[in-house]
A protein has these predicted regions:
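Bacterial lipoprotein signal-peptidase II cleavage site
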Residues: 46-60
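N-terminal segment of the mature folded domain
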Residues: 59-198, 257, 261-263, 274-282
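Ligand-binding pocket segment of bilobal, Venus flytrap-like solute-binding proteins
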Residues: 118, 219-313
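Periplasmic-binding protein-like
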Residues: 149-166, 288-343
Length: 398
């Protein structure tokens, strides 16, 4: 099987320290043909991937699935690169389930970034969007025009811990906290041996080297959640607010989760924020986060403990936007605070009958049998309380 992947890493003009060194590394990477970031995977690629190995790799019992596999055969979606690895598994599982039921289906997902996904959804160019931030305000109002007679619903399909990944020779363990992270990403701390970092890492040999921050150059829900975390937990050290575009003022840009992970993997002295699954794939070192009570390493268990406290903004069936502010500020022992919920954004009404049936069928599969083995991909499967609410909302799509 051959998979064609378009790869690109975008670096903006120098916006902070270490720019020339970083760009020199990028030039060397381009000359050597290194892979720098996944931009898109075509629908035929996903279909081929599923038909080659879904039945053997997913181990799904189709008879136990509530997915009907009805409606149109091909769905299109775009958005969050953070959920790409999870979406690959959801699609593979769904194809496998429907194959066992005698149906041929496919979902083409382009990990173009959360902001782009929301834009394409509003324009009616895709059937649903993937986003690490809920659609809201003006965009939600515009979505009502697309969802004729309905509105856009944010449906959480998976939780993804955000890793603070770094490349620092000789430093296998690093502890940071929200205040120090805020100062690193706003330019207040520029050296790895800064006293504030040293105070959190007693006995560690920290080099007298510049810190190169790597940020998302595209509109990203991961960026939004990372900045919300800094805003909530840094005791006022972060004053740049939040949003899908990075507002901190310093950093070298790379496109997508794959882009920032690849950039840090090849740039000594660098640091970024990226989903755990991409940090794992690139074998990056990941910092522990000191929450005020203790330093907490990022594991599936520590992320799950934090996510267990997630709350919805509404008790109604339908939109399931989560309030993660309490998680960001947690000091519960053994709870990792830096997590995001990644959503599928759908129309509550307004689809034609074939699209509605297909969207509901795919989401039903993703919300249930699709959750199996997600931990192996660096995600946290849905807690039962979220899963129950999600299934009710999927059923309510008309």
């Amino acid at each position: 099987m051959q998979i064609s992947i378009i790869l690109r890493l975008m670096s903006p003009p120098d916006r902070g320290r270490g720019g020339s060194d970083f760009r020199r590394i990028l030039v060397n990477l381009k000359r050597s043909g290194a892979l720098l970031g996944v931009v898109a995977v075509g629908a035929m690629t996903l279909a081929a991937c599923g038909s080659d190995n879904n039945s053997s790799s997913t181990g799904v019992d189709a008879s136990a699935s509530n997915a009907t596999c009805e409606g149109k055969s091909n769905l299109s979606a775009a958005g969050s690169s953070a959920q790409k690895n999870a979406m690959d598994q959801f699609v593979a599982t769904y194809i496998s389930v429907c194959q066992e039921k005698g149906k041929t289906v496919n979902v083409a997902y382009n990990p173009s970034g959360s902001g782009d996904g929301r834009t394409q959804f509003i324009a009616g160019q895709i059937d649903f969007a993937g986003s690490d931030s809920a659609i809201k305000d003006e965009q939600a109002d515009k979505a009502k025009e697309r969802c004729v007679g309905g509105e856009a619903w944010n449906l959480p399909l998976v939780f993804g811990p955000i890793a603070v990944a770094y490349n620092l020779d000789g430093v296998d363990k690093l502890v940071l906290n929200a205040e120090v992270l805020a100062k690193i990403f706003n330019g207040g701390i520029t050296k790895w041996n800064d006293p504030a970092i040293a105070a959190l890492n007693s006995g560690a040999s920290l080099p007298d080297e510049k810190i190169t921050t790597v940020i998302r150059s595209d509109s990203s829900g991961t960026t939004d959640n990372f900045q919300k975390y800094l805003d909530a937990a840094s005791n006022g050290a972060w004053t740049s607010g939040a949003g899908s575009d990075f507002t901190g003022g310093v950093g070298e840009g790379a496109k997508g989760s794959a882009g920032v992970a690849q950039a840090v993997a090849t740039a000594p002295g660098s640091i970024t924020y990226v989903e755990k699954s991409f940090a794992d794939q690139n074998k990056l070192s990941v910092a522990e986060i000191n929450t005020g009570s203790e330093a907490v390493a990022l594991t599936n268990d520590t992320a799950a403990k934090s996510i267990a406290g997630a709350k919805f903004k509404s008790d109604a069936t339908g939109d399931l936007t989560l309030d993660l502010a309490s998680i960001f500020k947690t000091n519960e022992a053994g709870a990792y605070p830096l997590v995001l919920a990644t959503y599928s954004i759908v129309c509550s009404k307004g689809y034609d009958a074939d699209t509605s049936a297909a969207v509901k069928s795919f989401l039903t599969s993703a919300a249930n049998e699709g959750q199996a083995n997600l931990a192996e991909q660096g995600y946290v499967p849905l807690p039962s309380n979220v899963q129950d609410r999600l299934n009710a909302s999927i059923t309510a799509i008309s």
